[in-house]
């Protein structure tokens, strides 16, 4: 597991979180309490912040990356599940969403509370 600072900003990962091996988290990343991050997840907060709420599950092989410019962060609410291999880029997921396996959520997209995004959706 690699939890690394980037440009003076260090990830915040509470002790209540479960972070598996082969996970890379770097930059301005803040995880809420009781999150689970499964193997081969990459969180890259190089340009803006990534903020993840409590009780969120990020499954195997996901990429979470910020966009350049104002408003390009990634905000993930509480109780969210992000399925295997999904890509989240500069977007907002509100509370209790389910993002299907392999889905891609692009810059500026907002997924409202309790929404389901189908596997493979773009």
List where the protein language model places each region:
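Terminal amphipathic alpha-helical/low-complexity segments used for targeting or macromolecular assembly
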Residues: 1-16
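Left-handed beta-helix
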Residues: 15, 20-21, 26-27, 32-33, ...
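Phosphate/pyrophosphate-binding betaalpha-module
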Residues: 49
